[in-house]
UniProtKB/Swiss-Prot annotation:
It comes from Arabidopsis thaliana. This is Beta-amylase 6. The gene is BAM6. Keywords: Carbohydrate metabolism, Cytoplasm, Glycosidase, Hydrolase, Polysaccharide degradation. SUPFAM superfamilies: (Trans)glycosidases (SSF51445). GO terms for cellular component: chloroplast; endoplasmic reticulum. Substrate binds at D119, H159, D167, K362, H367, T409, N448, A449, R485. It holds the Pfam family Glyco_hydro_14.
Length: 577
């Protein structure tokens, strides 16, 4: 009798599904369906039942459509990209260490990585003056990436590098913009103490002509337009497949509420960033309009490193956030952020309209204090998310409006890895945000928030990339994953062998696929943004929903010592040859 395990592809066997003392490893209904699907694979092909034109009641011979095992598995393929170093292009707009980079890219290509991601720094390209764009160094970089057959995700980085976790270089926003800020510091985000954050421009100046006759949004638009014009060959040839639009600090759609340059230390709740004169004036006008001129911007929300329960605003049982005044402020604060993202994504959509690529925007994974009533760290960042109010649905709807991918962070994190005092819930947060995107019918991608080289971190990413494991439909499945970040430590052993094992699992144990349409990633011309729903409608749809079902652990895990054994095997074969 043929063994059940013998019928299965050995690459798919995972001990977590085997129940001791049982010859059949069924954990629940969904697991049973996956197992039955895998058992239908025999001799490299999968037979899928097809309904005939005649009625199903007629007892005629069943017709089958034969699909290859590889084709079916590719529906579960998640492409993986690697972020290049932050300073791969220097402040002087020069591509340094070109030969070293080529060696690294060659190694990445051999590992079967799908592509790379790179920050295209506003502070470098437009440093000489308004509309004086210098793209030569980036063109040189893109040509090298193309020569290795790698795809490219380009970030329109309208923020400063330096001051965020992991920043190892300092690249400010353009000097001529900073000089405008010297005479008008209210162009920058400001906390209640009056401290300015020069990491990026405040959303309050999006539509103010303060920058040599242009608004902030017009500067972002012109920059993206120049990028498209100067990189047309890389776009049309399919090298550049993704434009991530910077929308705030670290390129993320949020306020700079937890900046290390301001003294923030994890897990501080952060501070609201709406005290520049433009946002202050806007709020005062809004409260007068609704008949509450006595309402002021919060002065009782603590400081960067406060604990929620120690503040009057975030106090769990009777905090300001629970009252009418607090609710109005948080609605206004989050709405300003949504308007900001909506407007810039609309400009990006117009700039890249018709291009065969995706646009994307990143949302920060603020997981600390998630398991408290007030979600204080999320609120100060602009995500109005509570137990009875979903703060991510509106963001997902904005992405849907502009045909954009929602890119989320902290996919590698587990609750048990976080300090108890932080009340963190990265697993629940990831499930909530990804589910919000999938429920809206948009593509969702992700990143790790911190560098990881261990199988536990990788296994958590694999789980979040395919929450229900490998299955016939491949859904739900993340559109892609970008690994943070290329380094010598990643490329050294045994880390690199573990990373290659991770790539294999993300690719559903298939070889690198150069034809995206085979895993349902065909790039079509970008369509114009939808305008069938207003932002006000988005803001009203805040009812929480249960997240999609999620396995406890991935069905394609990297097992203990697996990468080490792979390394020993490859070393042995190399020496033997």
């Amino acid at each position: 009798m043929t063994s059940v395990l013998g019928m299965m592809n050995p690459n798919l066997i995972n001990g977590r599904n085997l129940h001791k003392g049982s010859s059949i490893f069924v954990q629940d209904k969904e697991t049973k369906k996956r197992v039955q699907w895998r058992l239908s694979i025999k001799e490299g092909s999968l037979r899928t039942h097809q309904a005939t034109a005649s009625s199903a009641t007629e007892p005629k011979a069943t017709e089958f459509n034969t699909t290859t095992y590889e084709d079916k598995m590719l529906t579960n393929y998640v492409p993986v990209y690697v972020m290049l170093q932050l300073g791969v292009i220097t402040n002087d707009n020069v591509l340094e260490n070109e030969e070293s980079l080529k060696k690294q890219l060659k190694k990445l290509k051999q590992s079967q990585v799908d592509g790379v991601m790179v920050d295209v720094w506003w502070g470098i390209v437009e440093s000489k003056g308004p509309k004086q764009y210098q793209w030569s160094a980036y063109r040189n970089l893109f040509a090298i990436v193309q020569s290795f057959g790698l795809k490219l995700q380009a970030i329109m980085s309208f923020h400063r590098c330096g001051g965020n976790i992991g920043d190892d270089v300092n690249i400010p926003i353009p000097k001529w913009v900073l000089e405008i800020g010297d005479s008008n510091p209210d162009i920058f985000y400001t906390n209640k103490s009056g401290n300015r954050n020069k990491e990026c421009l405040s959303l309050s100046v999006d539509n103010l002509s303060l920058f040599r006759g242009r608004t902030a949004v017009e500067m972002y638009r012109d920059y993206m337009k120049s990028f498209r014009e100067n990189m047309e060959d890389f776009i049309s040839s399919g090298v550049i497949i993704d434009i991530e639009v910077g929308l705030g600090p670290a390129g993320e759609l949020r306020y700079p509420s937890y900046s290390e340059t301001q003294g923030w230390v994890f897990p501080g709740i952060g501070e609201f960033q709406c005290y520049d004169k433009y946002l202050r004036s806007d709020y005062e006008e809004e409260v007068r309009r609704i008949g509450h001129p006595e309402w002021k911007l919060p002065e009782n929300a603590g400081e960067y490193n406060s604990v929620p329960g120690e503040t009057e605003f975030f106090e769990y049982s009777n905090g300001t956030y629970l009252k009418e005044e607090g609710n109005f402020f948080l609605s206004w604060y989050s709405k300003k952020l949504l308007l900001h993202g909506d407007q810039i994504l609309d400009e990006a959509n117009k700039v890249f309209l018709g291009c065969k690529l995706k646009i994307a925007a990143k949302v920060s994974g603020i997981h600390w204090w998630y398991k408290t009533e007030s979600h204080a760290a999320e609120l100060t960042a602009g995500y109005y998310n509570l137990k009875n109010r979903d703060g991510y649905r509106a963001i997902a709807k904005i992405m849907r409006r502009h045909h954009a991918i929602l890119n989320f962070t902290c996919l590698e994190m587990k609750n048990t890895e976080q300090p108890a005092k932080a009340k963190s819930g990265p697993q629940e947060l990831v499930q909530q945000v990804l589910s919000s995107g999938w429920r809206e019918g948009i593509e969702v991608a992700g990143e790790n928030a911190l560098p990881r080289f261990d199988r536990n971190g990788y296994n958590q990413i694999i789980l979040n990339a395919r929450p229900n494991g490998v299955n016939q439909d491949g859904k739900p499945r993340m559109f892609g994953f970008t690994y943070l970040r290329l380094s010598d430590k990643l490329l050294n052993e045994p880390n690199f062998s573990t990373f290659k094992m991770f790539l294999k699992r993300m690719h559903a144990n298939q070889e690198y696929c150069s034809e995206p349409e085979r895993y349902n990633h065909e790039l079509l011309p970008l369509e114009r943004s939808r305008n069938d729903e207003s932002l006000e409608m988005f803001m009203e749809e805040t009812e929480p929903f249960d997240p999609f079902p999620w396995l406890d652990e991935t069905d394609m895990s990297i097992r203990p010592f697996e990468s080490v054994l792979s390394l020993l095997r490859s070393t042995f074969l190399r020496k033997k040859s």
